[in-house]
């Protein structure tokens, strides 16, 4: 596991900038008003890939061996030819003029932001195991706060060479969307992280099938991104889309809060579609608003900063919301067993000789007789639930579903905060010049928005 984490970190060094860099390149070569359309296409493709990836990965993971190599290893190997093809295409087609500018690299800023965020992410994930007031948790709090304080101090001294120049936050749009990005990221990734768990643990779907069952979410993202991009390109108005989109995300998350262990899939699919429509209307216009509000020379840093804040919010959201899930699931499973124990069907099942003889059922039956804990072991391994007798499996599914409902409700609450902040998002007229054209000598300064707005 440590090797996996280390190599993923190495992979992240190269991959971390690809998403924001693609959006920054669009910002450089396409005027904001026309850019909305292309960013809509970009996010639609991204959403499609987000579903195809888990499906393909699940297919590989489900194979014991392919060409003499363990199936799950192909999840990583398949990226090599895809990355090579992308490298060749970019090298042959992306030929943009660029000017070199001497600047200092903000090594200290990169170190301090890592020192600040890693301990906070760690305690958000491990706090339920360590104890939120334990020595290790307190150490993470202190190191995290000191690291972030040192990062802010370093950025103020680095000026224009900072990872995130402090002057950016004097721009109202950038400052507001940075906070919104953290909040939306928390609600988005934190809430959605429970969906595959619901589909696999509660509904019993395989990893491949659960990826396919996320298609309504992807369809919503595609429709929301493309429609908002087309309308913004025609009207030049963008503020209404993230406001309406965040409202749809809240509605979708609240609807997901009401799904249960026996909810038909079509109802879950409708909830995901509503949430995806909202998400598609939020991500693209927010990026567009940031790029339009900043001077052309700052678009790259501003775009990557916005992506950074969203990813950090997402990482915190996943860690915090999964902590909520797993800290409550044990008690909810026990409550579900207490309720089921009173039903004739459950009593019939536990007294059935065939059920008692099945070795998969024996640990649960022993726990029911007081020889173990119900719910504790399921946190680390849930695969056995799908092999249990249906009557014994149902309380586990109900317990997980109840905890996931809480996660969706917390996610909706976080998204409400984002919705309120988006109401105050300034709407600056979209420029008709690309950033590249605006930087050319003789370009009218009117193409650059007022940095104070």
Where are these regions (language model features)?
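C-terminal membrane-cytosol helix-exit motif in multi-pass small-molecule transporters
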Residues: 80-98, 114-126, 144-158, 418-427
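Hydrophobic/small/kink-forming positions within alpha-helical transmembrane segments
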Residues: 47, 51, 55, 114, ...
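Transmembrane-helix exit segments and adjacent C-terminal regions of multi-pass membrane proteins
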Residues: 85, 89, 98, 133, ...
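Small-residue-rich alpha-helical segments with characteristic i,i+4
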Residues: 19-20, 36-48, 52, 62, ...
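Interfacial helix-cap and linker-helix signal at transmembrane-aqueous boundaries
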Residues: 56-69, 124, 199-200, 231-232, ...
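Transmembrane core module of solute transporters
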Residues: 3-5, 108, 130-301, 317, ...
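MFS-fold secondary transporters
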Residues: 11, 90, 255-256, 275, ...
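Helix-loop-helix hairpins in multi-pass membrane proteins, especially solute transporters
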Residues: 1-108, 135, 219
């Amino acid at each position: 596991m440590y090797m996996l984490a280390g190599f993923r970190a190495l992979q992240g060094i190269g991959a971390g900038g690809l998403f924001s860099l693609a959006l920054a390149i669009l910002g450089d070569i396409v005027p904001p008003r026309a850019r909305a359309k292309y960013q809509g296409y970009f996010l639609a493709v991204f959403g499609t890939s987000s579903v195809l990836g888990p499906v393909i990965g699940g297919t590989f993971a489900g194979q014991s061996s392919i060409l003499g190599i363990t199936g799950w290893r192909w999840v990583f190997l398949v990226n090599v030819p895809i990355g090579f093809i992308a490298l060749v295409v970019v090298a042959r087609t992306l030929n943009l003029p660029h000017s070199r500018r001497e600047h200092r690299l903000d090594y200290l800023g990169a170190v301090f932001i890592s020192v600040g965020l890693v301990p906070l992410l760690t305690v958000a994930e491990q706090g339920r195991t360590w104890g939120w007031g334990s020595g290790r948790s307190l150490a993470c709090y202190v190191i995290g706060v000191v690291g972030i304080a040192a990062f802010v101090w370093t950025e103020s001294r680095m000026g224009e060479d900072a990872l995130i120049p402090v002057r950016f936050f004097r721009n109202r749009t950038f400052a507001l969307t940075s906070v919104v990005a953290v909040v939306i990221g928390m609600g988005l990734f934190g809430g959605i992280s429970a969906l595959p768990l619901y589909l696999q643990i509660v509904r019993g779907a395989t990893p491949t099938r659960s990826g396919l069952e996320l298609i309504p979410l992807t369809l919503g993202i595609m429709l929301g991104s493309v429609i908002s991009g087309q309308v913004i390109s025609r009207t030049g108005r963008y503020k209404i889309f993230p406001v309406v989109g965040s409202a749809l995300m809240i509605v979708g998350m609240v609807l997901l809060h009401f799904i249960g262990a026996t909810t038909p899939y079509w109802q879950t699919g409708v909830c995901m579609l509503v949430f995806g429509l909202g998400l598609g209307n939020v991500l693209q216009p927010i990026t567009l608003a940031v790029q339009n509000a900043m001077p052309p020379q700052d678009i790259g840093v501003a775009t990557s900063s916005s992506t950074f804040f969203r990813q950090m919010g997402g990482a915190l959201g996943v860690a915090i919301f999964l902590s909520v899930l797993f800290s409550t699931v044990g008690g909810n499973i026990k409550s579900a067993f207490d309720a089921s124990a009173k039903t004739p069907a459950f009593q019939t099942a536990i007294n059935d000789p065939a059920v008692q003889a099945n070795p998969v059922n024996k640990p649960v039956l022993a726990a029911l007789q007081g020889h173990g804990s119900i719910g504790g072991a399921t946190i680390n391994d849930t695969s056995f639930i799908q092999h249990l007798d249906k009557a014994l499996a149902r309380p586990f599914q109900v317990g997980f579903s109840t905890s996931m409902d809480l996660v969706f409700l917390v996610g909706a609450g976080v998204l409400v905060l984002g919705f309120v902040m988006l109401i105050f998002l300034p709407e600056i007229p979209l420029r008709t010049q690309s950033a590249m054209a605006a930087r050319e000598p003789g370009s009218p300064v009117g193409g650059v928005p007022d940095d104070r707005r």
